[in-house]
């Protein structure tokens, strides 16, 4: 998909974003961020993968830097499955960006993760109706990712319909959809799980935030984290 392609928008009734690649083409996932373990992106301890690229581009999106289809680390599905399983968590959460704009390779990843007995949770800005229409129109890649997802969170973010009562969602229109009965406890966990925010500071001082919080609270948190702090030298006698 080129950068000049129009955004579909949260209210668009248009078809889904990028179509499957030509047969025989090498499929990779454009990964913007890989987080080994988190308790802020779904029930239990999960590995989270944010993909690069989104055709929806909801106003007020928390991750506008992930809209562009340029960038990200290109990772083969088999390598991504191995990284997820090596993390040793309860399952995989797919976010973005828009996972269904990379449905074909992500379906391969999800299938590999589920084959190892782990659960898959997928966030999408498309509505369930849009996904169903895409499947009816012959989008086998979309059907495959739906078939390998245990818990779907569907619907665009709507800034004028903020949801502060349910975990993991940003607006009241977004819905939890349990796909199949393999992991029925996932949906039950929604009512028992609080919103969380996790802040990671790397060795170079870079700050990464994931999870869910109201904008004002998040701004205050980031300001406090970014504020220079006095340093105290420490050492250990041997």
Residue ranges and their predicted role:
Residues 71, 131-132, 156-170:
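Flexible glycine/acidic-rich beta-alpha junction loops that bind and position SAM and/or redox cofactors
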Residues 27-36, 45-46, 62-144:
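Conserved Radical SAM active-site core
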Residues 51, 96, 122-124, 201, ...:
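A cross-domain feature marking catalytic cores of carbohydrate-active enzymes
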Residues 102-114, 162-205:
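P-loop/Walker A phosphate-binding loop and immediately adjacent motor/lid segment at beta-alpha junctions
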Residues 124-125, 155-157:
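Short secondary-structure boundary segments
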Residues 150:
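Receiver (REC) domain switch/active-site residues of two-component response regulators
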Residues 1-50, 59, 63-69, 196-198:
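N-terminal [4Fe-4S]-dependent radical SAM core
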Residues 3-16, 206-238:
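Radical SAM enzyme core and accessory elements
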